[in-house]
Amino acid sequence: MSSFGAGKTKEVIFSVEDGSVKMFLRGRPVPMMIPDELAPTYSLDTRSELPSCRLKLEWVYGYRGRDCRANLYLLPTGEIVYFVASVAVLYSVEEQRQRHYLGHNDDIKCLAIHPDMVTIATGQVAGTTKEGKPLPPHVRIWDSVSLSTLHVLGLGVFDRAVCCVGFSKSNGGNLLCAVDESNDHMLSVWDWAKETKVVDVKCSNEAVLVATFHPTDPTVLITCGKSHIYFWTLEGGSLSKRQGLFEKHEKPKYVLCVTFLEGGDVVTGDSGGNLYVWGKGGNRITQAVLGAHDGGVFGLCALRDGTLVSGGGRDRRVVLWGSDYSKLQEVEVPEDFGPVRTVAEGHGDTLYVGTTRNSILQGSVHTGFSLLVQGHVEELWGLATHPSRAQFVTCGQDKLVHLWSSDSHQPLWSRIIEDPARSAGFHPSGSVLAVGTVTGRWLLLDTETHDLVAIHTDGNEQISVVSFSPDGAYLAVGSHDNLVYVYTVDQGGRKVSRLGKCSGHSSFITHLDWAQDSSCFVTNSGDYEILYWDPATCKQITSADAVRNMEWATATCVLGFGVFGIWSEGADGTDINAVARSHDGKLLASADDFGKVHLFSYPCCQPRALSHKYGGHSSHVTNVAFLWDDSMALTTGGKDTSVLQWRVV
C-alpha cells in the first residue's frame, strides 16, 4: 500500500494486490480498477503531463438580453459588440467572425462605448473563486481593436455588481459614470484615465436601470429606474440632483430607457408604454406620446437623420417616430424572438435589436427582422455532438432543442418541447436524437426533419442521461429515480422497446458510458458509486475482472480510473458536472461549478493532474463534448445560458 497526499484523509490509496486505486469524496471511498496493462508500472507519484493541445475560444452562442439593457452597439470596424456570461463579444456579421474580450472573471452586466468609438467600458458582478475568496465587482476599460485592458476601476469600491456605466460625450469623454447594486445604488463619477474617483453619491433606494451623460453638456447626467428619473449636475466635485416632475402625467412604475435628440430634448420610455419628452435643460415634460407601446418601452435609439426608434416589450413592436413624434413606420418582431430589449443603429437603415429571449436580430422597420444570434433563455444541461457531422444539439430548462452547425454557427432547426430538457444523445447513425426531460418523459426526434419519432415515460423524475450503444442496438435511459431503463433499438433508432431496468444504485444516475463493443455499460450516481451492467439481462456485473480491461467508447463518467485526476484536493463530489474524452483518446475536458473548463491529458489517472484552465462561462459549466473530428470542444453554461465553442489548437 502507498498513500498520496498529506491531507486530512489519505486522498488516494493505491493497492497493488487488488490492482485498484481508492479516492475519497466527502470521506466516502470510491474504488477504481486499474487495467492490467497499466498495473505493473503504475505509481501515484508519477507526474502527470500537461496536454500538448490547448483550447482557444472560437465562438460564443447567446446574448444577455433577459435582464440587461443598452448592451448592443455597432462599432466602426463593422462589428457589433454585446456580452453574455463573462465574455464581451465583437461579432463581424459580414465576415462571420467573432473576437472576444476575456478580461472579466464573472458575469458582465453593462457596457458603454466611448465617443472615440474604440474604447469600451464593461462592468461586472461580484464573484467568488473556487477557494471561496471574493472577486470584487469592477469596471474594465479596454481597447476594442487590440482587446488590451487599459484600466480597471473600482476594486473594493463597488458593492454586489456594477449595473450601469456611461462615458461623458462632450469633453473628450474623459469621465465615466457608474452605478452599483448596493442598497443605496451609489452613483460614482471617475476620471477613468487616471483611475481616480471624482465623486460619489447615493442615487436611489430603488433599482437604477440607466446612467448616462448628456451629449453636449458634460456637467449633466441622467439616471432613471424604478419610479424615478433624476437630472444630476456635476459642479466643483459634487453632484446635485433634481427630480423629474411628472405633474399631470401618470408617474410610471419604471422609467426604462432614455435617449437624446439633436435639438437637446431628452426622451424617456417607461413601463406604462409612454414616451415623455423633457425640454432642453429642464426637468419637466414638454410633450408626451401616451400609449406609444402596449406594455413597456424597453429601448430607445436616436437615429442619425433625427428620427427616433422605440422598441416595445409586450407588443414586440419596433416603431419609427418623426422629429415631431408622429409615427412614421412600425414592424412587429416575431413572437419566438421575444420582447425587444434594446435597439442599435447600423449602416444605412439597418437596425440591430436585442431581445429579452436572448436573441439578436438584424433588419429595418421597412423590411422586418431576421435572426442573427440565437440564444437559450434558461439553464442549459443537455449537449450532444453528431457522430459524423460538424453539428451539435443543445437543450435546457427553456424547453428549446436546437440543432446547431458548428461551421455556420447558426441553428439548423429549433424545436419547442413540452417539458424542460436535461439530456441528449445521438443514435450512431446520426439520424435520430434522444432528448431526456425533467419529468421522466423522453423523446426521439428525427435529426433531418426534427419531427417527433416517439415519446416515452420512465418514472416521474429527471432523465439525467440518454445514451445509445455504439452498435446502435440499445438505448440506456438514466433517471433520478436511481434506475437505468434499457431499450432495444431497431430501424436506425426509430423503433425502441423496453427490455428492462437496472436496479442497484442507491442514489440518482448522473453519468453513463458504453463499452466499445456494446457488451456492457458503466454508471455513476449521486453518492459516488460506480456500477457495471449487462444490457442484455439488465443485471449488475459484480466481477471486477469481467470489466477491468474493458475499452470504453466514451468517457463521460466523472468517476473512474481513467479520469480521477480531474478531482482537486478536498473536492466535493458535485464540483465537476461533466467530462468528455476526445475521440482520439488523447484529451479530457472537464466542466466545473466555478465557471471553468479544464483540459487534461488522457488517461488522467494521477492524483490532481495538471491542466490548462479556461474562463468564459460565469456560473457553473454544465456540460462538455468534443465534435466528431476533435477539431472543437463545446461547453454549456448553467445560469449564463451560453454555449461556448473552443478550437482545439
UniProtKB/Swiss-Prot annotation:
Source organism of this protein record: Homo sapiens (Human)
Subcellular localization(s) per the UniProt record: Cytoplasm, Cytoskeleton; Cytoplasm, Cytoskeleton, Spindle
Start and end residues of each stretch annotated as Tandem atypical propeller in EMLs: 10-649
Gene Ontology BP terms: microtubule cytoskeleton organization; negative regulation of microtubule polymerization; regulation of microtubule nucleation; sensory perception of sound; visual perception
Coiled-coil portions: none
Protein known as: Echinoderm microtubule-associated protein-like 2
Effect of residue 484 to L: In a colorectal cancer sample; somatic mutation
Gene field: EML2
Subunit architecture: Interacts with GRID2 and may also interact with GRID1. Interacts with EML3. Binds unpolymerized tubulins via its WD repeat region.
Task of the protein: Tubulin binding protein that inhibits microtubule nucleation and growth, resulting in shorter microtubules.
Keywords: Coiled coil, Cytoplasm, Cytoskeleton, Microtubule, Repeat, WD repeat
Record-linked PANTHER family: ECHINODERM MICROTUBULE-ASSOCIATED PROTEIN-LIKE 2 (PTHR13720:SF50), WD-40 REPEAT PROTEIN (PTHR13720)
Domains (record comment): Contains a tandem atypical propeller in EMLs (TAPE) domain. The N-terminal beta-propeller is formed by canonical WD repeats; in contrast, the second beta-propeller contains one blade that is formed by discontinuous parts of the polypeptide chain.
Gene3D superfamilies in the cross-refs: YVTN repeat-like/Quinoprotein amine dehydrogenase
A GO CC term attached to the entry: microtubule
Keyword Coiled coil: yes
UniProt record similarity statement: Belongs to the WD repeat EMAP family.
InterPro entries: Beta-prop_EML-like_2nd, Beta-prop_EML_1st, HELP, Quinoprotein_ADH-like_sf, WD40/YVTN_repeat-like_dom_sf, WD40_repeat_dom_sf, WD40_rpt, WD_repeat_EMAP
Expression tissues: Ubiquitous.
Ranges of the WD repeats in the UniProt entry: 56-93, 97-144, 151-192, 195-234, 241-280, 285-323, 369-406, 410-447, 452-489, 495-535, 564-602, 609-648
GO MF annotations in UniProt: microtubule binding; tubulin binding
